[in-house]
Each structure stands twice: as structure tokens, then as C-alpha cells.
Amino acid sequence: MKSNSQIKGVSRGFTLIELIVGIVVLSLSFSLLITLILPLSEKSAEQLHQVRASELGQSMMNEILARAFDENSDMAGGLVRCSEGTTDCTSPDENDFPHLGPDDSETRQTFNDVDDYHGYDSDNTDDENALNEKFSSLYPGFRVQVSVCYSEFDGVCNTTSVELAKLIIITVTTPQDFDFVFSFYKANF
């Protein structure tokens, strides 16, 4: 007759069925874990892109608001507004000159009034900031588009006459192709 210690010594290890059940349980737990974590990582990137788009939109808004209302405005103290007296504001008509948009050889670094940003698209240029850092390296995959038009504070662009305010619309597109739209007014004062 064999002792208990001899019987225990013979029955060491796992059976084939126990190994298969262990592999199945492990694979099910990994698949469940991946199913739960993978969507969270995508959401994490989406939230990061939302924050970066907000930063970029706010930065462009601050840059544009720091400019004069119009090319024909008094840029030395703002005592005389365009459309008062003998100075007309820039025409909203694309066929007139000067019209909304950058002047002949202006670049983003030399924009001096709000409507110079009309038609700006970061895909068409690789601008640098004041620290000589390229836009494409600071915000890879992002795109900024700017539209400027005259408006009566109603959110509607007026393309036929000069108004007391310009509506600026900034659209920031993230690498995941989500558009974030920022709109604000610059008044003629």
C-alpha cells in the first residue's frame, strides 16, 4: 500500500482540460479588458484634440482682436473711424478695391487690420509665430480657416454694405476631422 505522500507526488501538474479552461478564461478576460479600454483611449485623444482646438481658436481670436478694425481706420489712437468724414471703410464687394482680405503682398506677420485675415487658411501656408516656431510643428494635423464679413450683430454676413461691426468666424479642424467654430465681432470704434 502506498502512503499519502507517494500519491500526492504522482498527481502533480495540470490536466489538459484544466489548461484549456485556463486559456479560455484568460482569453475572455483579455478580450473584455481590451473592449473596455480601447474606446477610452480614443476618447482620451478626442478630449486632447478638443483642448488643443480651443487653445488654437482662442489664440487666433486674440491675435485678430489686437488688430485695427479696418485698413482705413486711424491706427494712432483711433480718433477717426473709417466711414466718418472722408475715409471710407474697406468694401465688402470682392470686385471693389480695396476689398476684404489681405493686401497685395501681406502675410500673417504683416496683417494690420481684421479683414486681412479674410480667407486665411493654415493649409495654404506654413506660418511661424513670434518665436519662429512653425504652425505645422506646434499643431500637427490641425487646420485653421478664417472668414471676415460685415454684420449687424445678428450673425448674418452682409456682402453689400458696410456695417458698424465685422463678424469674424474661425474654424479649427482637428486631426480627427471635427470642426470647432469660434465667432466674434470687432466693432468700429
Regions found by a protein language model. Give the residues of each.
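N-terminal leader/signal peptides at the extreme start of proteins
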Residues: 1-14
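Short amphipathic alpha-helical leader/targeting segments
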Residues: 2-4, 34, 41, 47, ...
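A general, composition-driven signal for non-globular sequence regions
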Residues: 6, 46, 137-139
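Aliphatic-rich helix starts adjacent to a transmembrane/signal segment
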Residues: 14-58
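Low-complexity, Gly/Pro-rich coil/beta segments used as flexible assembly/activation regions
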Residues: 54-55, 61-189
